[in-house]
Curated annotation (Swiss-Prot):
Cofactor(s) this protein requires: [4Fe-4S] cluster
Positions bearing N6-acetyllysine: K197
Gene this chain is encoded by: RSAD2
Protein name listed in UniProt: S-adenosylmethionine-dependent nucleotide dehydratase RSAD2
Annotated positions binding [4Fe-4S] cluster: C83, C87, C90
Gene3D superfamilies assigned to the protein according to its UniProt record, in alphabetical order: Aldolase class I (3.20.20.70)
Pfam families: Fer4_12, Radical_SAM
Amino acid sequence: MWVLTPAAFAEKLLSVFRQPLSSLWRSLVPLFCWLRATFWLLATKRTKQQLVLREPDETKEEEEDPPLPATPTSVNYHFTRQCNYKCGFCFHTAKTSFVLPLEEAKRGLLLLKEAGMEKINFSGGEPFLQDRGEYLGKLVKFCKVELRLPSVSIVSNGSLIRERWFQNYGEYLDILAISCDSFDEEVNVLIGRGQGKKNHVENLQKLRTWCRDYRVAFKINSVINRFNVEEDMTEQIKALNPIRWKVFQCLLIEGENCGEDALREAERFVIDDEEFERSLERHKEVSCLVPESNQKMKDSYLILDEYMRFLNCRKGRKEPSKSILDVGVEEAIKFSGFDEKMFLKRGGKYIWSKADLKLDW
């Protein structure tokens, strides 16, 4: 098929009017063909342009598939909020006295294992407060024997632990972390870790011995705050020789240790980033030191509360998900605010099974 240019079309049109009417139809036939071809070409061009514009959108839709839910590799289960200490900066305070029935807690732990959990850390409150440590011991044994978790750990203030507990449950526990913010007993009293006639530091040394005797890896957690920020703990930490010394910057959580609904007023304990860095510099010779600033700490932990709800701390306060017992792990973890990249960046995954630590007991 041939196509006329606009100039040729005008010339042809003039020639039509010069011809007799008898030949008019023969002259118009090529014009109709030209018009038809022209409109067809325009329509084809427009369709191609629309396809080109649409392709990136379709690609974008394919790229914007919803992300897969996070895997609960390491979970911190605060099964109780009750505590026998009154640490001024505590960010998980005794707002309820609820503790799940043992079998319900086990059901939730099984759900977590099925979702990919490798490490469980029991915390509080003070976890040894419930049933004098028996509730905790049964959960520890369940996780190691029945769930076969690579790592089972506890964070405690250490004041209620007895040697009998190690005799009954020590073999099932990988790591015991004891909170110790100062080796000056007067500072411990100021912070709220006073034990009356007991000495927190002396008790820490006794627990270190029990951990060695019963083959439990020993760890120390310290919160750097206004009252201990100038203290040098290098020699004491080296003498105790923990596998890890976790050093946290004092953190404010609205509704827990600051704000109208809080049970603590932690503002007086807060230090700035520069002060925290100076404290870390002072302890740089401690090889087991693992620092955690507020930035690293806030969103890099998967925290379950006493109802087995994930707690989202992204907005500076704890916003609970629905319980994993009601909606399952995959649905609840979507609302956890968990930053998996920061978890890995802060060294959240490490050698955490005592079988792999190869310790010289």
